[in-house]
């Protein structure tokens, strides 16, 4: 092999060398693999409308889910509270998955522990694991809050978190001064957004259940983001509220703990919503739920426990949605919209005008969580784009109906199709049969782009990376997608993807380069 200390190749150029190619050929002979022609025949068949029809008749099988499980969301919610240690009651392997998932997205260490239930706990229950786990976690990591969620193992055998935690405190395994909110988060129903919602309900019950709040006693607003992984969105919310001189509390704010500096000091806990902020939440003017399709239990808490209206707002993604949020904040707080925000809005409108000739009429397929997909679809319509294929694996029929209503109201949405309870293998079929210009989604879409390219350059559907997770590109999680600032970022991302593809399509010397222009 030609690997030397002076010339070290990574796997891509290394495995292209003759000796490795020969090794692969010899290995393939032992695998009893189908010949290349048969593989190509089957691949071509999976790109057809006939295969799509079979694909959509699947009932008991998910291939490449476009969602994750509940405890993942519960962990993210917990990370947003100050001095809080996420604690998962269940399998250690599950927690390794959650930590790895967030490690790869945020490029940060993720503090999260498990009480490592194994075979004996699966038979006799996990009470002993809970006792020892809470004792060790509090002694080793000195948290002020331990936020407990569950994996499938604990849920299948029916472990009672409330009783386990109460007994652990009574028996002295964990100090009574440590708050232990909890949520049942079974992975076999719902998704990561459900887990976030359930965990937030657990925090609300722990800190406010015994408090009779007085809405409006404090002249501030509460903002609840739901499952949100763009750290810039937390910062832009705080900036906009500060510019309007509106006091606010972001209830669950992980923007510091998931973006700590490299200065020689490890911060297991950094920033986050304090216990006092959570306790005072019922005294705020109102609580705005910024991703309402995923925050059903949170809405119930706000309206029934805190006696606040939970004034309806949509995810603040795009021009009109940000307008609506700021007007709602102004109405509730009595504060005018800041001149700086009006100026920022004007810049966004100018950008939309500058780029409309390249974005108008472009067809997009997109997938993701319900609120994100609805917000992005709305913004695409504002830009004159055509979102022809829209898929959300974890959405419901009410969401689908609301999406169709929004699409029918726009001339750019009348040819759109909305799919729910469908996975990325369904989406793959749709990319072949509908052939949009681009797809928008998380990193998993790169495999669909690769497959469309394998059919031929004319069939390629390039991926524009927006959403979660983003494993294969760096630092995108720090960006902003909400507010006018976020809309500017999205316009920039979309139009430059269009122009990159145009440059690629017109770069053949003497053949297509008559449109390989310097100015776009």
Swiss-Prot record:
Keywords: ATP-binding, Iron, Iron-sulfur, Metal-binding, Nitrogen fixation, Nucleotide-binding, Oxidoreductase
A Pfam family annotated for this UniProt entry: Oxidored_nitro
Coiled-coil features, chain-numbered ranges: none
Binding site for [8Fe-7S] cluster: 69, 94, 152, 187
GO cellular component, one term: molybdenum-iron nitrogenase complex
Cofactor: [8Fe-7S] cluster
UniProt keyword Iron-sulfur, yes or no: yes
Catalyzed chemical reaction(s): N2 + 8 reduced [2Fe-2S]-[ferredoxin] + 16 ATP + 16 H2O = H2 + 8 oxidized [2Fe-2S]-[ferredoxin] + 2 NH4(+) + 16 ADP + 16 phosphate + 6 H(+)
The record's free-text note on cofactor binding: Binds 1 [8Fe-7S] cluster per heterodimer.
E.C. number(s) listed in UniProt: 1.18.6.1
Xref: Gene3D superfamilies: Nitrogenase molybdenum iron protein domain, Nitrogenase Molybdenum-iron Protein, subunit B, domain 4
CDD domains in the record: Nitrogenase_MoFe_beta
GO molecular function: ATP binding; iron-sulfur cluster binding; metal ion binding; nitrogenase activity
Top class in the EC scheme: oxidoreductase
Taxonomic superkingdom: Bacteria
GO biological process, one term: nitrogen fixation
InterPro entries named among the record's database cross-references: ChlB/BchB/BchZ, Nase/OxRdtase_comp1, Nase_comp1_CS, Nase_Mo-Fe_CF_bsu, Nase_Mo-Fe_CF_bsu_N
Keyword ATP-binding: yes
Subunit structure: Tetramer of two alpha and two beta chains. Forms complex with the iron protein (nitrogenase component 2).
UniProt record similarity statement: Belongs to the NifD/NifK/NifE/NifN family.
PANTHER family per UniProt: LIGHT-INDEPENDENT PROTOCHLOROPHYLLIDE REDUCTASE SUBUNIT B
Function according to Swiss-Prot or TrEMBL: This molybdenum-iron protein is part of the nitrogenase complex that catalyzes the key enzymatic reactions in nitrogen fixation.
Protein name: Nitrogenase molybdenum-iron protein beta chain
Species assigned in the record: Klebsiella pneumoniae
């Amino acid at each position: 092999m030609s690997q030397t200390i002076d010339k070290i190749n990574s796997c891509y150029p290394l495995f292209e060398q003759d000796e490795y190619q020969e090794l692969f050929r010899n290995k393939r002979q032992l695998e009893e693999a189908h010949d290349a022609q048969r593989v190509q025949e089957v691949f071509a068949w999976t790109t057809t409308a006939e295969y799509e029809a079979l694909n959509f008749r699947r009932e008991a099988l998910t291939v490449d889910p476009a969602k994750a499980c509940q405890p993942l969301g519960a962990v993210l919610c917990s990370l947003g509270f100050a001095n809080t240690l996420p604690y998962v009651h269940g399998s250690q392997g599950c927690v390794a998955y959650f930590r790895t998932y967030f490690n790869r997205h945020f490029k940060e260490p993720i503090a999260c522990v498990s009480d490592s239930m194994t075979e004996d706990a699966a038979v006799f229950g996990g009470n002993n694991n809970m006792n020892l786990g809470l004792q060790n976690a509090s002694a080793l990591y000195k948290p002020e809050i331990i936020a407990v969620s569950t994996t499938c193992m604990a849920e299948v055998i029916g472990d009672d978190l409330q009783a386990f935690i109460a007994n652990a405190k009574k028996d002295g395994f964990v100090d009574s001064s440590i708050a232990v909110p909890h949520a049942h988060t079974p992975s076999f129903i719902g998704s990561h957004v459900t887990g976030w919602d359930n965990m937030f309900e657990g925090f609300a019950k722990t800190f406010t259940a015994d408090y009779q709040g007085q809405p409006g006693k404090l002249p501030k607003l509460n903002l609840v983001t739901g499952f949100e992984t763009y750290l810039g969105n937390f910062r832009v919310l705080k900036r906009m509220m500060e510019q309007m001189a509106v006091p606010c509390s972001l209830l669950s704010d992980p923007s510091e703990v998931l973006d700590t500096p490299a200065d020689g000091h490890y911060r297991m806990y950094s920033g986050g919503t304090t216990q006092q902020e959570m306790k005072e939440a019922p005294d705020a003017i109102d609580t705005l739920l910024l991703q309402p399709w995923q925050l059903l239990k949170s809405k119930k808490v706000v309206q029934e426990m805190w006696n606040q209206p939970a004034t309806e707002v949509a995810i603040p993604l795009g021009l009109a949605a940000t307008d609506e949020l700021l007007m709602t904040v102004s109405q509730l707080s009595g504060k005018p919209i800041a001149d700086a925000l009006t100026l920022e809005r004007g810049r966004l409108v100018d950008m939309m005008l500058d780029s409309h000739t390249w974005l108008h009429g472009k067809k997009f397929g997109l997938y993701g969580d319900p609120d994100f997909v609805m917000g992005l679809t709305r913004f695409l319509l504002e830009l004159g784009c055509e979102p022809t294929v829209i898929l959300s694996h974890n959405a419901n029929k009410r969401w689908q109906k609301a999406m169709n209503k929004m699409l029918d109201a726009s001339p750019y949405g009348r040819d759109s199709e909305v799919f729910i309870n469908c996975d990325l293998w369904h989406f793959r079929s749709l990319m072949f049969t509908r052939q949009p210009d681009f797809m928008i989604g998380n990193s998993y879409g790169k495999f669909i782009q690769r497959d469309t390219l394998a059919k031929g350059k004319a069939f390629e559907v390039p991926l524009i990376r927006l959403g979660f997770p983003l494993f294969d590109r760096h630092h995108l999680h720090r960006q902003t997608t909400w507010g006018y600032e976020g809309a500017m970022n999205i316009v920039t991302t979309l139009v430059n993807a269009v122009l990159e593809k145009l440059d690629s399509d017109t770069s053949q010397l003497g053949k297509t380069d008559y449109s390989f222009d310097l100015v776009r």
